[in-house]
Regions:
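Acidic, low-complexity intrinsically disordered segments
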Residues: 25-248, 252
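Alpha-helical structural signal in soluble globular domains
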Residues: 79, 83, 125, 129, ...
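Radical SAM enzyme core and accessory elements
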Residues: 1-49, 85-88, 100, 169, ...
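Short, hinge-like loop/turn segments at secondary-structure boundaries
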Residues: 66, 104-105, 150-154, 172-174, ...
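Structural detector of well-ordered beta-strand residues that form the stable sheet scaffold
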Residues: 134, 155, 178-179, 282-284, ...
Length: 519
């Protein structure tokens, strides 16, 4: 038992964090100030797409930022006309400031809440030097008036539809201040992302895939509940996904769908298509996917080695307040066992600071995670994103503490909790990460299959206890070379495991019938 007051008995030592992980690269480090506004040569038909820098949380693993690339900007790049040269730049790969010699004619910048300030800094820097700047992303949708002064045009909605239109208008000097598109188009018509633009060695895998768009839930705290964001559930043909997986020639893929399991009939079909590849993958699903244990078996046979599940809370009252459709929390443990019985690891996501959370929530959550041997856990302080139901509720109650968007990163308390102080919420958040990333907790959650323990420990220590080294792996392009041997070993074990699984009876949910793949 963990004492309810343990998180508050002593202060958690602050983890060391390299300056490169908290501070964006200087934009004018090599130029005298007098030259900052001098005219620059602007190359026609040259576009740069930028994912801005954001400060990393010292409590969490830095590795989560480079597991797989985001797809939005390289998906837009795939729609760029052939006579345009396009470049992709992710500031979080620690390669310095974005390209500026020659100055691109067009700069597209994605804007999210926690790096809006950096996005505006980049936008202003490029505009004064002659580039046309297009801002898009969720923050543009939720706070367009805040973004407009920093852009030549705003892209509100599906950028895959908007990007070619914007470039055409730039060519004809008819650029409009705003462009809008819905997410209701047939998703299967989108071209595959342009992965050739990626710095491949800086990611665990470059094969981030999207098979579906949207989610059957609309939780009040989720960014999908943002005003104006209507994202009907859309699915790509399974064979399209298979061809994209094969084309990138990687052994491991991460599905970055909001919820791959919203349509179980579709997921059954997708698993049937993926199974012949003999590759491995992970995905985000909701825990109710275990309503159909035969689907869990098919996922394992298709190569699923891990799932990211938003448990959010162990309180039914909190989940009801959030309008999340989910099974009773008392049934979570049984459902986790079903996943484990089929060799599927669980990364549980938990939100801390709901209105029914008291100061014992940290100890109770940590204890439950250890009892149920979740291989990994991710934590977030409840954060009211602008233009969501949660933000409106807290604003009406006078509980919003400030609007420093940089701190709306789910690692800081930006509102007044009901049953603790903001400082206690932040201390509990730091404690639970400290607890779950400790040697003792990692060992408590080891697989029951002793043969899987060495690989589990190697991955756990690299991911959870190597923050001192992650910035070096990222900066020097060593993420993929270091991870790939572990991924290959995981794939080898899982291929052997699912051969045994395929030969077994299809009886579902009997603990011990299936040996954990340990991946």
């Amino acid at each position: 038992m963990i004492a309810p007051d343990e998180p508050f008995l002593r202060s958690i030592p602050k983890r060391w964090i390299p300056r490169e992980m908290t501070t964006a690269p200087a934009l004018d480090s090599s130029e005298p100030k007098a030259a900052a506004v001098e005219p620059h040569y602007v190359e026609p038909h040259y576009a740069v797409l930028i994912n801005p820098f954001y400060s990393k949380d010292a409590n969490a693993s830095f590795g989560k930022h480079v597991l797989t690339p985001t797809l939005a900007l390289i998906s837009f790049a795939a729609t760029t006309p052939a006579h345009w040269r396009v470049e992709y730049w992710d500031e979080n790969l620690l390669q310095g400031r974005p390209p500026f010699r020659p100055m691109p004619q067009v700069v597209g910048i994605t804007v999210h809440l926690t790096f809006a300030r950096r996005a505006f800094e980049l936008a202003d820097w490029y505009r004064v030097r002659g580039s046309k700047v297009i801002l898009g992303g969720l923050h543009v949708l939720s706070c367009p008036e805040e973004c407009a002064p920093h852009a030549d045009a705003l892209a509100l909605g599906d950028g895959v539809q908007l990007w070619p239109r914007i470039l055409r208008d730039i060519e004809t000097n008819s650029l409009q201040p705003r462009y809008g598109a819905t997410y209701e188009n047939d998703y299967c018509d989108d071209p595959p992302p342009r992965r050739s633009l990626l710095r491949r060695r800086s990611f665990l895998t470059t094969t981030s895939l999207i098979a579906t768009r949207g989610c059957h839930n609309r939780c009040g705290f989720c960014y999908l509940a943002t005003d104006g964001l209507r994202m009907p559930y859309r699915m790509r043909h399974p064979q399209q996904v298979v061809e994209e997986f094969k084309a990138d020639r990687q052994p491991y893929a991460v599905f970055i769908d909001n919820n791959l399991g919203s349509r179980r009939d579709y997921l059954h079909s997708l698993c049937a298509a993926l199974r012949p590849l003999n590759k491995i993958w992970s995905a985000a699903v909701t825990i109710d996917v275990t309503d159909d244990p035969s689907l869990i078996r098919n996922m394992a046979l298709a190569g699923c080695t891990g799932v990211f599940i938003g448990f959010e809370s162990l309180s039914d009252d909190n989940l009801a307040d959030s309008h999340k459709k989910t099974p009773k929390t008392s049934d979570y443990a049984r459902r986790v066992r079903i996943l484990h019985d089929y060799g599927i690891q669980v990364n549980g996501s938990f939100v801390l600071g709901f209105d029914h959370d008291r100061k014992d929530v940290f100890a109770r959550t940590a204890e439950w995670i250890e009892e149920n041997r979740l291989e990994c856990a991710t934590f977030h302080i409840l954060t009211p994103y602008p233009a969501t139901p949660l933000f409106r509720q807290m604003e009406a109650q006078g509980r919003i503490l400030h609007r420093d968007w940089n701190l709306y990163d789910t690692g800081h308390a930006v509102f007044q909790p009901q049953h603790m102080t903001p400082q206690e919420l932040e201390q509990g958040y730091a404690w639970i990460y400290h607890r779950l990333f400790s040697h003792a907790s990692i060992w408590r959650r080891r697989p029951e299959d002793w043969q899987a323990i060495p690989l589990y420990l190697a991955m756990s220590y690299l991911y959870k206890r190597s923050n001192r080294f992650w910035h070096l792996l990222i900066k020097h392009g060593l993420v993929n070379p270091v991870w790939k041997p572990l991924v290959k070993m995981t794939r080898w074990r899982h291929v052997r495991y699912r051969r045994r699984l395929a030969q077994r009876e299809t009886t579902i949910g009997a603990p011990g019938q299936v040996v954990s793949a340990g991946v």
